Amino acid sequence: MVTLRRRRTRCLLLLVVASTVVSAGAQESLVTGRVELFDAESPKKEANAPDVVVWLEPAAGAPSVTRLTNSSQAQVLRLVQEHKSFHPRLLVVEVGASVEFPNHDPFFHNVFSLFEGKRFDLGLYEAGTSYMVHFDRRGVSYIFCNIHPEMSAVVMALNTPFFGVSDSKGNVAIPGVPRGRYVLRIWHERATPDALKSLSREVTISEDSRSFGVLRVVETTALNLAHKNKYGQDYVPPLPSNPAYRRP
């Protein structure tokens, strides 16, 4: 009799837990919106608006929230080096995530980031090898190669799982957002900090409000995106493919 009661109690507890999870999951929303890019030198809207990061942080006084679905911390994240380029060009992760840097080129690379965000230097490593980097602090990490100056990427570590990156048409989707009050923030590589800060605002996600609307971002080509090597010096120009002298 006692055993039967214990079984019933366990079943009731399982039902309560399951119903709580389902109920919480039903409160999650797919938050959508759109980004438009404008050139600071011209009022004309850009045709494409990719790689704009939009994320949501719990507003002051709002209860803390957790996404039930898997976060980027549990995923295998990679920034591949191939054809003297990083793929993808932009990677957004949660703080605490690890990113793999495999070398798929038939020659050496030297990946480093010494300016903002996570600071590291992987040194020279050959084709077919790979290294992991743990992004344990919030911020934007600009990734370069000490051998090939044309290689660059960005890893952005956020203290929230609720983020999305715009596609080529400017569409943004942030999945699994629980209902509540949030602060919306935005980042774009060619926008000034003041321009980005002006777009930040508080939003409320509810059954009737699942869109943050249209964000109009002004980008500027005046921002200097050039960089030095890991020693703070200019890159050595590559040797010419043809000899400088002529045959007699």
Language-model-derived ranges and their functions:
Residues C11-T20:
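Bacterial N-terminal signal peptides
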Residues V22-A26:
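Sec/Tat signal peptide C-region and signal peptidase I cleavage site
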Residues V2-L12:
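Bacterial N-terminal signal peptides that target proteins for export
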Residues Q27-P248:
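Extracytoplasmic copper-binding redox domains, predominantly the cupredoxin/blue-copper superfamily
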